[in-house]
Amino acid sequence: MSTIKYRAACDHCSATKIKCTQERPQCTRCRALGRDCHYSRSLRAGKPPRSSQGLNRKISNAPVLPRQNTPVSNPTSMSSKPEHWPTMPTSYPTPQAAAPTAEIFHFPDLSSAATSSSSSPANTDWFFDFNSGSADGLGDLTPPLVVTAPHLPPLDHDLKHPVFPTQGIHFGAFADLISLPPASPLLPSPSLADGDRCAKLATETLNSLYDMPANHLHGSGNRHPSVDQTLSTCARAVQAIHELVNCSCQKDLYLPMLIIIVASKIVAWYQAVAYIRDPGTGFADGKQCFREVVVEGPLNIGAYQLDDEVGWTLKNQIVLGQLQRLNEAVNIYDRRYCSDSLGGQMTEGGKLYASMVGFVKSTLQFTIHALEGRIRSGHPR
Protein backbone atom coordinates (compact mmCIF):
# COMPACT_ATOMS: atom_id res chain seq x y z
CA MET A 1 0.00 0.00 0.00
CA SER A 2 1.42 3.40 -1.09
CA THR A 3 2.05 6.16 1.41
CA ILE A 4 -0.41 9.03 1.40
CA LYS A 5 1.26 12.24 0.25
CA TYR A 6 0.15 15.63 1.44
CA ARG A 7 0.54 19.04 -0.13
CA ALA A 8 3.64 21.09 0.68
CA ALA A 9 1.56 24.14 1.69
CA CYS A 10 -1.52 24.28 3.88
CA ASP A 11 -4.92 25.03 2.43
CA HIS A 12 -5.06 28.65 3.64
CA CYS A 13 -1.64 29.55 2.20
CA SER A 14 -2.47 27.81 -1.06
CA ALA A 15 -5.81 29.61 -1.39
CA THR A 16 -4.25 33.03 -0.75
CA LYS A 17 -1.14 32.35 -2.89
CA ILE A 18 1.26 32.94 0.05
CA LYS A 19 4.41 31.00 0.74
CA CYS A 20 3.83 28.52 3.57
CA THR A 21 6.47 27.70 6.21
CA GLN A 22 5.30 24.02 6.13
CA GLU A 23 5.37 23.59 9.88
CA ARG A 24 3.32 20.88 11.52
CA PRO A 25 0.80 20.88 13.06
CA GLN A 26 0.43 24.66 12.38
CA CYS A 27 2.37 26.95 10.07
CA THR A 28 3.48 30.41 11.14
CA ARG A 29 0.65 32.24 9.34
CA CYS A 30 -2.13 30.02 10.67
CA ARG A 31 -0.68 30.22 14.16
CA ALA A 32 -0.64 34.04 13.98
CA LEU A 33 -4.23 34.19 12.71
CA GLY A 34 -5.49 31.52 15.10
CA ARG A 35 -6.72 29.21 12.34
CA ASP A 36 -6.66 25.46 12.03
CA CYS A 37 -3.82 24.43 9.77
CA HIS A 38 -4.96 21.71 7.40
CA TYR A 39 -2.93 19.94 4.72
CA SER A 40 -4.87 18.30 1.91
CA ARG A 41 -3.79 15.29 -0.03
CA SER A 42 -1.41 15.86 -2.86
CA LEU A 43 -2.80 15.27 -6.33
CA ARG A 44 0.58 14.79 -7.93
CA ALA A 45 0.41 11.02 -8.14
CA GLY A 46 1.08 11.19 -11.85
CA LYS A 47 0.66 13.78 -14.52
CA PRO A 48 -1.46 16.79 -13.60
CA PRO A 49 -5.05 16.57 -14.83
CA ARG A 50 -5.67 18.24 -18.18
CA SER A 51 -9.26 19.13 -17.43
CA SER A 52 -10.52 21.83 -15.11
CA GLN A 53 -11.63 19.32 -12.49
CA GLY A 54 -8.41 19.73 -10.59
CA LEU A 55 -8.92 23.50 -10.34
CA ASN A 56 -12.49 23.02 -9.19
CA ARG A 57 -11.32 20.55 -6.56
CA LYS A 58 -8.77 23.08 -5.23
CA ILE A 59 -11.41 25.74 -4.93
CA SER A 60 -13.82 23.35 -3.21
CA ASN A 61 -11.21 22.47 -0.58
CA ALA A 62 -10.93 26.11 0.54
CA PRO A 63 -12.93 26.80 3.71
CA VAL A 64 -16.08 28.82 3.25
CA LEU A 65 -17.26 31.07 6.05
CA PRO A 66 -20.91 30.81 7.04
CA ARG A 67 -23.11 33.44 5.43
CA GLN A 68 -26.11 34.98 7.07
CA ASN A 69 -29.19 35.15 4.94
CA THR A 70 -30.99 38.43 5.40
CA PRO A 71 -34.60 38.46 4.34
CA VAL A 72 -35.48 40.84 1.53
CA SER A 73 -37.70 43.57 2.79
CA ASN A 74 -40.58 44.96 0.82
CA PRO A 75 -40.33 48.39 -0.84
CA THR A 76 -42.49 50.01 1.82
CA SER A 77 -40.16 48.95 4.63
CA MET A 78 -37.13 50.30 2.78
CA SER A 79 -38.72 53.66 2.21
CA SER A 80 -39.70 54.01 5.87
CA LYS A 81 -37.06 55.39 8.23
CA PRO A 82 -36.80 54.81 11.97
CA GLU A 83 -37.76 57.75 14.06
CA HIS A 84 -34.44 57.89 15.93
CA TRP A 85 -32.41 58.48 12.78
CA PRO A 86 -31.05 62.08 12.69
CA THR A 87 -31.86 64.21 9.74
CA MET A 88 -28.56 65.50 8.35
CA PRO A 89 -28.56 68.75 6.37
CA THR A 90 -27.90 68.39 2.67
CA SER A 91 -27.90 70.73 -0.27
CA TYR A 92 -29.76 68.17 -2.35
CA PRO A 93 -33.48 67.45 -1.84
CA THR A 94 -34.84 64.09 -0.81
CA PRO A 95 -37.08 62.58 -3.50
CA GLN A 96 -40.66 61.80 -2.57
CA ALA A 97 -41.31 58.23 -1.46
CA ALA A 98 -43.12 56.13 -4.01
CA ALA A 99 -46.55 54.85 -3.12
CA PRO A 100 -46.97 51.08 -2.69
CA THR A 101 -49.21 50.95 -5.71
CA ALA A 102 -46.83 53.11 -7.77
CA GLU A 103 -45.68 51.68 -11.00
CA ILE A 104 -41.99 50.85 -11.35
CA PHE A 105 -40.28 53.26 -13.71
CA HIS A 106 -38.93 51.60 -16.83
CA PHE A 107 -36.34 53.29 -19.03
CA PRO A 108 -37.65 53.71 -22.57
CA ASP A 109 -36.19 51.88 -25.50
CA LEU A 110 -33.92 54.26 -27.37
CA SER A 111 -34.34 52.31 -30.58
CA SER A 112 -38.08 52.83 -30.56
CA ALA A 113 -39.29 55.75 -32.68
CA ALA A 114 -42.55 56.14 -30.73
CA THR A 115 -40.88 57.13 -27.47
CA SER A 116 -42.34 60.26 -25.93
CA SER A 117 -40.17 63.36 -25.63
CA SER A 118 -41.04 63.65 -21.93
CA SER A 119 -39.29 60.36 -21.08
CA SER A 120 -36.27 60.58 -23.41
CA PRO A 121 -34.93 64.02 -24.35
CA ALA A 122 -34.36 64.53 -28.06
CA ASN A 123 -31.91 67.37 -27.64
CA THR A 124 -28.59 66.64 -25.88
CA ASP A 125 -27.61 70.31 -25.43
CA TRP A 126 -29.11 70.26 -21.93
CA PHE A 127 -26.14 68.17 -20.78
CA PHE A 128 -23.71 71.03 -21.49
CA ASP A 129 -25.99 73.90 -20.42
CA PHE A 130 -24.88 74.78 -16.91
CA ASN A 131 -26.92 77.98 -16.59
CA SER A 132 -30.42 76.68 -17.33
CA GLY A 133 -32.57 75.70 -14.37
CA SER A 134 -34.04 72.55 -15.89
CA ALA A 135 -33.41 70.61 -19.04
CA ASP A 136 -35.94 70.01 -21.80
CA GLY A 137 -37.78 66.82 -21.15
CA LEU A 138 -36.50 66.38 -17.57
CA GLY A 139 -38.20 69.30 -15.88
CA ASP A 140 -41.05 67.13 -14.58
CA LEU A 141 -38.73 64.41 -13.27
CA THR A 142 -36.01 66.53 -11.65
CA PRO A 143 -36.93 68.57 -8.56
CA PRO A 144 -35.30 71.97 -7.93
CA LEU A 145 -31.83 71.74 -6.40
CA VAL A 146 -32.15 74.66 -3.95
CA VAL A 147 -33.39 74.00 -0.42
CA THR A 148 -33.80 76.94 1.90
CA ALA A 149 -32.66 76.76 5.50
CA PRO A 150 -36.00 77.57 7.28
CA HIS A 151 -37.58 74.31 6.03
CA LEU A 152 -34.95 72.16 7.78
CA PRO A 153 -35.58 71.18 11.42
CA PRO A 154 -33.11 72.62 13.95
CA LEU A 155 -30.60 70.06 15.10
CA ASP A 156 -27.85 70.00 17.68
CA HIS A 157 -24.64 69.02 15.95
CA ASP A 158 -21.26 68.26 17.28
CA LEU A 159 -18.49 70.80 16.78
CA LYS A 160 -16.51 68.17 14.92
CA HIS A 161 -19.08 68.24 12.13
CA PRO A 162 -19.92 71.91 11.44
CA VAL A 163 -23.02 72.65 9.47
CA PHE A 164 -22.59 74.95 6.52
CA PRO A 165 -25.49 77.12 5.38
CA THR A 166 -27.34 75.62 2.45
CA GLN A 167 -27.65 78.08 -0.37
CA GLY A 168 -27.82 77.94 -4.13
CA ILE A 169 -24.73 78.44 -6.25
CA HIS A 170 -24.96 81.64 -8.27
CA PHE A 171 -22.76 81.93 -11.34
CA GLY A 172 -23.40 85.64 -11.76
CA ALA A 173 -20.43 86.51 -9.54
CA PHE A 174 -18.09 84.66 -11.89
CA ALA A 175 -19.45 86.22 -15.07
CA ASP A 176 -17.39 89.37 -14.57
CA LEU A 177 -14.23 87.34 -14.12
CA ILE A 178 -14.88 85.35 -17.28
CA SER A 179 -15.58 88.46 -19.35
CA LEU A 180 -12.38 90.25 -18.31
CA PRO A 181 -10.10 91.01 -21.29
CA PRO A 182 -6.72 89.27 -21.36
CA ALA A 183 -3.84 91.19 -19.87
CA SER A 184 -1.97 92.99 -22.62
CA PRO A 185 1.83 92.77 -22.57
CA LEU A 186 3.79 95.84 -21.57
CA LEU A 187 4.90 97.19 -24.94
CA PRO A 188 6.16 100.66 -25.80
CA SER A 189 3.63 103.06 -27.23
CA PRO A 190 3.44 103.30 -31.04
CA SER A 191 4.52 106.95 -30.98
CA LEU A 192 7.78 106.14 -29.15
CA ALA A 193 8.51 103.20 -31.44
CA ASP A 194 7.91 105.38 -34.52
CA GLY A 195 10.16 108.08 -33.07
CA ASP A 196 13.01 105.59 -32.72
CA ARG A 197 12.45 104.41 -36.29
CA CYS A 198 12.52 107.99 -37.61
CA ALA A 199 15.74 108.76 -35.72
CA LYS A 200 17.35 105.64 -37.16
CA LEU A 201 16.19 106.52 -40.69
CA ALA A 202 17.54 110.09 -40.45
CA THR A 203 20.89 108.91 -39.10
CA GLU A 204 21.32 106.24 -41.78
CA THR A 205 20.37 108.71 -44.53
CA LEU A 206 22.91 111.28 -43.33
CA ASN A 207 25.62 108.60 -43.13
CA SER A 208 24.87 107.50 -46.70
CA LEU A 209 25.32 111.08 -47.92
CA TYR A 210 28.67 111.41 -46.14
CA ASP A 211 30.00 107.92 -46.90
CA MET A 212 29.08 107.74 -50.56
CA PRO A 213 31.10 105.03 -52.39
CA ALA A 214 34.07 106.60 -54.20
CA ASN A 215 35.10 104.23 -56.97
CA HIS A 216 36.17 106.63 -59.72
CA LEU A 217 39.45 108.50 -59.93
CA HIS A 218 39.27 112.29 -60.24
CA GLY A 219 41.72 114.51 -62.12
CA SER A 220 43.27 115.57 -58.81
CA GLY A 221 44.24 111.98 -58.04
CA ASN A 222 41.51 111.39 -55.43
CA ARG A 223 38.63 108.98 -55.72
CA HIS A 224 35.08 110.36 -55.77
CA PRO A 225 31.62 108.97 -56.54
CA SER A 226 30.26 108.97 -60.06
CA VAL A 227 27.22 110.89 -61.30
CA ASP A 228 24.88 107.90 -61.41
CA GLN A 229 25.88 106.84 -57.87
CA THR A 230 25.22 110.36 -56.59
CA LEU A 231 21.83 110.63 -58.30
CA SER A 232 20.75 107.24 -56.92
CA THR A 233 21.80 108.04 -53.32
CA CYS A 234 20.23 111.51 -53.35
CA ALA A 235 16.94 110.19 -54.76
CA ARG A 236 16.66 107.76 -51.83
CA ALA A 237 17.50 110.58 -49.42
CA VAL A 238 14.69 112.79 -50.81
CA GLN A 239 12.23 109.95 -50.31
CA ALA A 240 13.45 109.55 -46.71
CA ILE A 241 12.92 113.29 -46.06
CA HIS A 242 9.29 112.98 -47.18
CA GLU A 243 8.75 110.04 -44.81
CA LEU A 244 10.31 111.92 -41.89
CA VAL A 245 8.33 115.16 -42.24
CA ASN A 246 5.02 113.33 -42.78
CA CYS A 247 5.43 111.00 -39.78
CA SER A 248 3.27 111.98 -36.78
CA CYS A 249 5.56 110.47 -34.15
CA GLN A 250 6.83 112.32 -31.10
CA LYS A 251 10.16 113.88 -32.05
CA ASP A 252 12.68 115.26 -29.60
CA LEU A 253 14.59 118.53 -29.97
CA TYR A 254 17.39 117.08 -32.09
CA LEU A 255 15.50 115.03 -34.68
CA PRO A 256 14.11 118.10 -36.57
CA MET A 257 17.65 119.51 -36.62
CA LEU A 258 18.91 116.24 -38.10
CA ILE A 259 16.19 116.30 -40.77
CA ILE A 260 17.08 119.79 -41.99
CA ILE A 261 20.80 118.92 -42.04
CA VAL A 262 20.01 115.97 -44.32
CA ALA A 263 18.07 118.32 -46.63
CA SER A 264 20.99 120.76 -46.83
CA LYS A 265 23.39 117.91 -47.64
CA ILE A 266 21.11 116.77 -50.50
CA VAL A 267 21.14 120.29 -51.99
CA ALA A 268 24.96 120.35 -51.79
CA TRP A 269 25.28 117.08 -53.72
CA TYR A 270 22.84 118.18 -56.42
CA GLN A 271 24.80 121.42 -56.83
CA ALA A 272 27.94 119.33 -57.37
CA VAL A 273 26.19 117.20 -60.02
CA ALA A 274 24.88 120.30 -61.88
CA TYR A 275 28.09 122.31 -61.42
CA ILE A 276 26.33 125.12 -59.57
CA ARG A 277 28.30 127.07 -56.98
CA ASP A 278 26.24 128.99 -54.47
CA PRO A 279 27.98 132.26 -53.47
CA GLY A 280 26.10 132.26 -50.16
CA THR A 281 27.96 129.17 -48.91
CA GLY A 282 31.38 130.82 -48.67
CA PHE A 283 33.32 131.65 -45.51
CA ALA A 284 34.07 135.11 -44.10
CA ASP A 285 37.50 135.27 -45.81
CA GLY A 286 35.92 134.63 -49.21
CA LYS A 287 37.20 131.06 -49.53
CA GLN A 288 34.95 128.12 -50.34
CA CYS A 289 35.41 124.49 -49.36
CA PHE A 290 33.41 121.95 -51.34
CA ARG A 291 33.52 118.36 -50.16
CA GLU A 292 30.89 117.27 -52.68
CA VAL A 293 32.82 116.34 -55.82
CA VAL A 294 31.60 113.95 -58.50
CA VAL A 295 33.42 112.35 -61.40
CA GLU A 296 31.94 113.11 -64.81
CA GLY A 297 31.11 110.19 -67.02
CA PRO A 298 28.83 109.32 -69.90
CA LEU A 299 25.22 108.43 -69.07
CA ASN A 300 23.77 105.26 -70.56
CA ILE A 301 20.18 104.21 -71.21
CA GLY A 302 20.53 100.48 -71.50
CA ALA A 303 23.02 99.82 -74.30
CA TYR A 304 22.65 103.34 -75.70
CA GLN A 305 25.25 105.90 -74.58
CA LEU A 306 24.15 109.54 -74.50
CA ASP A 307 26.36 112.22 -75.94
CA ASP A 308 27.65 115.09 -73.86
CA GLU A 309 24.93 117.66 -74.62
CA VAL A 310 22.00 115.29 -74.26
CA GLY A 311 23.55 113.89 -71.08
CA TRP A 312 23.74 117.33 -69.50
CA THR A 313 20.15 118.11 -70.48
CA LEU A 314 19.00 114.86 -68.88
CA LYS A 315 21.00 115.56 -65.71
CA ASN A 316 19.49 119.05 -65.39
CA GLN A 317 15.96 117.69 -65.70
CA ILE A 318 16.60 114.93 -63.13
CA VAL A 319 18.18 117.32 -60.62
CA LEU A 320 15.43 119.93 -61.09
CA GLY A 321 12.69 117.36 -60.51
CA GLN A 322 14.31 116.03 -57.33
CA LEU A 323 14.91 119.55 -55.96
CA GLN A 324 11.25 120.43 -56.51
CA ARG A 325 10.26 117.33 -54.53
CA LEU A 326 12.69 118.34 -51.80
CA ASN A 327 11.19 121.85 -51.77
CA GLU A 328 7.76 120.36 -51.00
CA ALA A 329 9.19 118.47 -48.00
CA VAL A 330 10.96 121.61 -46.72
CA ASN A 331 7.68 123.57 -46.88
CA ILE A 332 5.96 120.86 -44.81
CA TYR A 333 8.84 121.06 -42.32
CA ASP A 334 8.45 124.86 -42.11
CA ARG A 335 4.71 124.67 -41.37
CA ARG A 336 5.13 121.98 -38.76
CA TYR A 337 8.16 123.08 -36.74
CA CYS A 338 8.71 126.79 -37.45
CA SER A 339 5.25 128.41 -37.39
CA ASP A 340 3.17 128.87 -34.23
CA SER A 341 -0.41 127.76 -34.89
CA LEU A 342 -1.69 129.51 -31.75
CA GLY A 343 -0.25 132.87 -32.74
CA GLY A 344 1.85 133.14 -29.59
CA GLN A 345 5.54 133.76 -29.15
CA MET A 346 7.83 131.28 -30.89
CA THR A 347 9.91 129.07 -28.63
CA GLU A 348 13.70 128.89 -28.68
CA GLY A 349 13.56 125.58 -30.53
CA GLY A 350 11.21 127.08 -33.12
CA LYS A 351 13.59 130.00 -33.67
CA LEU A 352 16.48 127.59 -34.21
CA TYR A 353 14.48 125.53 -36.70
CA ALA A 354 13.35 128.70 -38.52
CA SER A 355 16.91 129.94 -38.98
CA MET A 356 18.10 126.56 -40.27
CA VAL A 357 15.19 126.10 -42.66
CA GLY A 358 15.66 129.67 -43.90
CA PHE A 359 19.23 128.86 -44.94
CA VAL A 360 18.15 125.66 -46.70
CA LYS A 361 15.29 127.44 -48.49
CA SER A 362 17.59 130.17 -49.82
CA THR A 363 20.13 127.64 -51.12
CA LEU A 364 17.38 125.47 -52.58
CA GLN A 365 15.66 128.35 -54.39
CA PHE A 366 18.96 129.59 -55.80
CA THR A 367 19.72 126.15 -57.27
CA ILE A 368 16.21 125.72 -58.72
CA HIS A 369 16.31 129.14 -60.40
CA ALA A 370 19.75 128.43 -61.88
CA LEU A 371 18.57 125.13 -63.39
CA GLU A 372 15.40 126.67 -64.78
CA GLY A 373 17.48 129.44 -66.41
CA ARG A 374 19.73 126.86 -68.06
CA ILE A 375 16.82 124.92 -69.47
CA ARG A 376 15.11 128.05 -70.83
CA SER A 377 18.30 129.35 -72.43
CA GLY A 378 19.03 126.05 -74.16
CA HIS A 379 22.54 125.88 -72.73
CA PRO A 380 22.76 122.77 -70.53
CA ARG A 381 25.79 124.11 -68.62
Curated annotation (Swiss-Prot):
Stretches the record annotates as Disordered: 41-88
Cellular compartments per GO CC: nucleus
Main subcellular localisation: nucleus
Annotated localization: Nucleus
Keywords: DNA-binding, Metal-binding, Nucleus, Transcription, Transcription regulation, Zinc
Source organism superkingdom: Eukaryota
GO molecular function, one term: DNA binding
An annotated GO BP: aflatoxin biosynthetic process
Biased composition (Polar residues): 50-59, 67-80
DNA-binding stretch(es), residue numbering of this chain: 10-37
Keyword Transcription regulation recorded: yes
Its biological purpose: Transcription factor that regulates the expression of the hps1-dma1 gene cluster that probably mediates the biosynthesis a derivative of cyclopiazonic acid (CPA). Further studies are required to whether the CPA-like hps1-dma1 cluster is functional or a non-functional relic reflecting evolution of D.septosporum.
PANTHER family: MONODICTYPHENONE CLUSTER TRANSCRIPTION FACTOR-RELATED (PTHR31069:SF31), OLEATE-ACTIVATED TRANSCRIPTION FACTOR 1-RELATED (PTHR31069)
Protein name: Hps1-dma1 cluster transcription factor tfc7
